[in-house]
Amino acid sequence: MNKRFQGKVAVITGAAQGIGRRVAERMAAEGGRLLLVDRSELIHELADELVGVAEVLTLTADLEQFAECQRVMAAALERFGRLDILINNVGGTIWAKPFEHYQEREIEAEVRRSLFPTLWCCHAALAPMIEQGSGAIVNVSSVATRGIHRVPYGAAKGGVNALTACLAFETAERGIRVNATAPGGTEARHGGFRNSAEPSEQEKVWYQQIVDQSLDSSLMKRYGSIDEQVEAILFLASDAASYITGITLPVAGGDLGCQSCSVMFSVSG
């Protein structure tokens, strides 16, 4: 097997399940030394599975809090002595409904879930990467920056895209690359709503409209697999992408998300 990450130290957030878990499994198999973070205790089960495969440290943390992100990066430095790769994978739609139906607390919760963990972790990772003169950051965004029933989530992920571009400008000459992937609809075991309430019949209809739009927007007319998302993340994190920084790569079967709007405006202008 290719050992693209031999000896590299990577922090992977949101690693207990889904895309983050598969990234961790693949990096471990390819020689990475990993600090895996999630708010769920399931993260420790993954560490047990990777015993004998890679050197792994797991932490539970609420990465919506600035201090927790600082604690995670400090733990990585204490254990491994350096930080080569950061994969920011925390986020996800909590509610799915037209914007006028959101309450203030729900809007704030969506932004806090899908923007702040990435913002805080990028900030916390900068000092060791700048000191080393190298590093690769991959932020997991979304093509949902253009779509229905997820305006606060789309705004948060739009912030991730802007963070990616701006931070790449600031850090490129210091040897740090910053990129993002923008997944489209993706088959996952834990899809759908991410709040504890039982969805109403109307909420189920709204969510199905998101699914239908995702399929209609994709040229391939299907959902992607977790492995298809992971391949893009691993590529951007690896040395094979050494001349790539500041991009948000749509991985959505041809759906470009908000980038399609930018292309349209630039052509018409």
UniProtKB/Swiss-Prot annotation:
An individual GO BP term: benzoate catabolic process via hydroxylation
Active site (catalytic residues): 153 (proton acceptor)
InterPro entries named in the record: BenD, NAD(P)-bd_dom_sf, Sc_DH/Rdtase_CS, SDR_fam
CDD domains: DHB_DH-like_SDR_c
Record keyword NAD present: yes
Enzyme Commission identifier(s): 1.3.1.25
Binding locations of NAD(+): 11-35
GO molecular function: 1,6-dihydroxycyclohexa-2,4-diene-1-carboxylate dehydrogenase activity; oxidoreductase activity, acting on the CH-OH group of donors, NAD or NADP as acceptor
Family: Belongs to the short-chain dehydrogenases/reductases (SDR) family.
Function: Degradation of 2-hydro-1,2-dihydroxy benzoate (DHB) to catechol.
Protein name: 1,6-dihydroxycyclohexa-2,4-diene-1-carboxylate dehydrogenase
Species for this entry: Pseudomonas putida
